[in-house]
Amino acid sequence: MKTNKEIEILLYNYIKGSELVNRVNGSLSHVGRPIGSKLEDIVVSCKSGTSGQFQSFVCDVNIYVPNINANGESLQNSSRIVELTSLCVPLFNKFVSTEFRIEYDETPKAIEIKGVNEYCINNRIVLTHLNLE
C-alpha cells in the first residue's frame, strides 16, 4: 500500500522529465512552493487516497503564473496560461503505465491568487496505483 507522500514523489518523478518542467522558469516541488517566489513554479500535492489493490489518489498539480504588467495594471498572462495548460493535457489526460494510471478529475482551470498578482493553473487529477505488494 502506498501513502500520499509516496504518490506525490511518484507523480513528481513522472513530471520531472517532461516538456512542462523544461518550459517553466521556476521549480518543481512536492514539498511546497518556495516562499516569496515570483516564478512559474509547479507544486504537486495529494489530497486523499484509498486503500486496496487499486488505490485511487486525488492529486493537484498547480502551476503558478505571474501576471503581466500592462500600463501599470496587473493582468492575467492568458497566453502563458494557455501555453502551459496545453502541455499539461497530454501529460495528465488518460496516461497509463504498468504501475499507475492518471486521468483528469476535472477540467484544468486558472484560479486567481488574490493579493499576489498571479494565477494558478489547477490540474486536479486522479492517480490510480496498482498495489501488487
Identify the function of each model-found stretch.
Residues S37-C46:
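A short, hydrophobic beta-strand-centered structural micro-motif
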Residues S27-K38:
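Short acidic low-complexity segments
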Residues M1-V24, S45-E133:
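Charged, amphipathic alpha-helical segments and their flanking helix caps
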